[in-house]
């Protein structure tokens, strides 16, 4: 039923100004639309990320958005660190840590948070 439809990720934030600086300035996403002080739409590849103002910002304790970056993961982690992004380190069964990367077999993943504490990640594929 929904297998041929695109999916849009939604992130709750407290301040759209702060979110705009992070998602556009730090992560390099392109802002394509906005609805006043309530919503910003960013483009990432062929998908969209809706960032909206909410009192529940940052309350999700699980990964909210993952970017599949392939072999660029190590370069992307370095570039984001250079922009001040701090990476999270977790103890997880089946994964070993190599610096800021968690590695399991051929998969590499790195987690970080936005200014509201939403958990985001990069994965090698």
Feature locations, PLM:
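Short acidic, gly/pro-rich beta-turn/loop elements at beta-sheet edges
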Residues: 19-21, 52, 61, 75-77, ...
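Flexible, glycine-rich phosphate/dinucleotide-binding loops
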Residues: 49, 58, 96
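Short secondary-structure boundary/capping segments
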Residues: 1, 31-32, 40-41, 55-57, ...
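Vicinal oxygen chelate
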Residues: 1-2, 6-14, 40-43, 56-125
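Short solvent-exposed loop/turn micro-motifs enriched in small/polar/acidic residues
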Residues: 33-35, 71, 103-105
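N-terminal beta-strand motif that seeds the catalytic metal site of vicinal oxygen chelate
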Residues: 1-20, 48, 62-65, 123-125
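Core segments of cupin and vicinal oxygen chelate
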Residues: 10-49, 54-55
